[in-house]
């Protein structure tokens, strides 16, 4: 099997393992929800716990058409998959980092000029939830690939229904806006249809 196919198979295996870990996390939350009123001290605590766990269960729902991760960072011989939510294995070790996590910021901000200790930034291509391709940028060597075809394909993908999730396509300038302090006023300018509201949302 060629090296590219071997690497793609390994990433698909990680995706499958991450989906299984997410399923276990949801089952655990459902078990807690089922027994929550038995361990709560009073009716108010039981109701609060129930609402919190119901939100958690909804947050842990898996959509097989949506990839769990869209990128990977290789930093000091460690691989960190970056996605839309945090997923852990049974020992609590991260399998997928939430895109909002501090370490994930490097996925958006690192460059060949300022690699931020990132050796490789990998972007994944998906079709209906199936991992089909990847592109690597060797930032630690000072190599930047330029415009990513995977990124362009994601940006140009037809939009259907409500505003689409944009976390896989955030650019460095947008990332700075998304992570700005809440008490900071920001003005975003641009032509209609260019995604101006996205950082605010």
Model feature map: region roles:
Residues 196-201:
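Motif I (Walker A/P-loop) of helicase-class P-loop NTPases
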Residues 185:
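Walker A (P-loop) ATP-phosphate-binding motif of ABC ATPase nucleotide-binding domains
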Residues 188:
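Hydrophobic anchor at the beta1->P-loop junction of P-loop NTPases
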Residues 182:
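Exposed loop/turn and edge beta-strand positions of beta-sandwich/beta-sheet ligand-binding modules
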Residues 192-193:
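The conserved Walker
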């Amino acid at each position: 099997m060629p090296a590219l196919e071997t690497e793609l198979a390994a990433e698909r295996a990680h995706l499958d393992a991450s989906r299984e870990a997410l399923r276990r996390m949801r089952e655990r939350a459902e078990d807690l929800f089922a027994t929550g009123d038995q361990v709560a001290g009073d009716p108010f605590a039981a109701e609060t716990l129930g609402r919190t766990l119901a939100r958690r269960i909804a947050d842990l729902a898996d959509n097989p058409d949506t990839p769990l991760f869209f990128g990977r960072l290789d930093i000091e011989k460690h691989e960190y998959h970056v996605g839309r939510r945090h997923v852990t294995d049974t020992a609590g070790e991260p399998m997928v980092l939430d895109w909002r996590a501090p370490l994930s910021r490097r996925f958006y901000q690192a460059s060949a000029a300022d690699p931020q200790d990132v050796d490789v930034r990998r972007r994944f291509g998906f079709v209906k939830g199936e991992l089909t391709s990847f592109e690597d940028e060797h930032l630690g060597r000072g190599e930047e690939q330029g415009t990513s075809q995977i990124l362009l394909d994601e940006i140009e993908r037809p939009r259907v229904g409500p505003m689409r999730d944009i976390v896989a396509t955030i650019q460095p300038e947008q990332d700075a806006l998304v992570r700005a302090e809440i008490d900071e006023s920001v003005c975003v300018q641009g032509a209609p249809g260019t995604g101006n509201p996205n950082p605010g949302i």
